[in-house]
Regions:
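Conserved donor-binding loop and adjoining core beta-sheet/short helix segment
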Residues: 63-136, 250-271
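Surface-exposed interaction/gating patches
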Residues: 184-253, 257-261, 267
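Short amphipathic alpha-helix that is part of the acyltransferase structural core
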Residues: 2-70, 194-229
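Short hydrophobic/aromatic beta-strand or adjacent loop that forms the aromatic wall/cage
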Residues: 84, 176-178, 243
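Conserved acetyl-CoA-binding loop-helix of GNAT-fold acetyltransferases
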Residues: 125-144, 165, 169
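Conserved GNAT acetyl-CoA-binding A-motif
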Residues: 146-157
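Conserved catalytic-core motifs of GNAT/GCN5-like acyltransferases
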Residues: 173-186
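Conserved active-site alpha-helix within GNAT-family acetyltransferase domains
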Residues: 158-176
Length: 271
């Protein structure tokens, strides 16, 4: 089970270049200066040697390459996100303690998501209090740096009490609980025969022409609060989907009655 949280974001303008966030060194981490949270630099990438970061390295490399173009292009016009924002926490720049990866959920930038929040070995050895302090500093800095965000969304496993407590301390409110399933189709999956469908139903692929039909269905079934938080447009739905994505359309009413979308990698908040 996973718990999904949201938090209202800053409604006032955020300074164009906020200073690096610093907090006193968390209990359990001896020596060094105050905790600092700053954008990840290219020279810091080889320092992320902990196993906790292994699966993030390709994403972090992409972020370093595309963060500049992402900021420039988004300032010119609403468009899908090219790369996430990556912040790193440290007392000594040569010894990263944790990383947070966040990204816009929509073209407008009104909703952001925490994609990854990872703690290194040194942070974990500091105990729960040390880990909570570092992760809280990372999330707080990510929220402060976002421009125009009206809401933030994060998810956490129900069993991770430290993560849940940290999110609650930062003002995140429980939104809903989900059960995640992993489906592994057989090697020779049966193919759907469109002729077997009722005559009034048409199997339609998601594309720019049909996207509005599926968007209307999703808007109708989403809880009102979640619909408001996500602030998703038709373009956002297309940006976040890839093929195969299909829907069943009632030809008489010209409405989608069912649909399944394949999400692009990283579109779901997985902290």
């Amino acid at each position: 089970m996973e718990a999904c949280f949201w938090q209202p974001g800053p409604l006032l303008a955020v300074p164009p270049a906020p200073p690096a966030a610093t907090t006193p060194s968390p209990a359990g981490l001896q020596g060094g200066g105050p905790l600092s949270v700053q954008p990840l630099k290219a020279w810091q990438l080889p320092l992320l040697q902990d196993a906790a970061y292994d699966d993030l390295i390709p994403l972090l490399q992409r972020a370093l390459l595309l963060q500049g173009p992402e900021r420039l292009l988004h300032s010119l016009a609403p468009r899908p996100s090219l790369a996430p924002e990556v912040l790193v926490a440290h007392r000594d720049p040569q010894q990263p303690l944790g990383v947070v990866v966040s990204e816009r959920c929509n073209r407008s930038g009104s909703c952001w998501q925490l994609q990854h929040l990872r703690s290194g070995d040194a942070c974990l050895q500091a105990g729960e209090a040390g880990r909570m302090a570092i992760e809280a500093a990372l999330v707080r800095a990510a929220i402060q740096r976002s421009r125009g965000a009206a809401s933030w969304i994060a998810s956490s496993a129900n069993t991770d009490n430290v993560r849940l407590a940290a999110l609650r301390q930062l003002g995140f409110q429980p939104l809903r609980r989900e059960t995640l399933w992993r489906w592994e189709p057989p090697a020779e999956a049966a193919q759907l025969n469109p002729a077997s469908l009722p005559s009034e139903l048409q199997l339609t692929r998601l594309n720019r022409r049909s996207a509005a039909t599926l968007w209307q269905l999703e808007q109708a079934v989403l809880p009102a609060q979640l619909r408001q938080l996500l602030d998703r447009s038709v373009d956002d739905l297309l940006d976040q989907s890839e093929q195969p994505s299909l829907m069943l359309v009632d030809a008489n009413r010209r409405q989608a009655v069912a649909g399944a979308r394949r999400l692009r990698l990283g579109q779901r908040p997985v902290v």
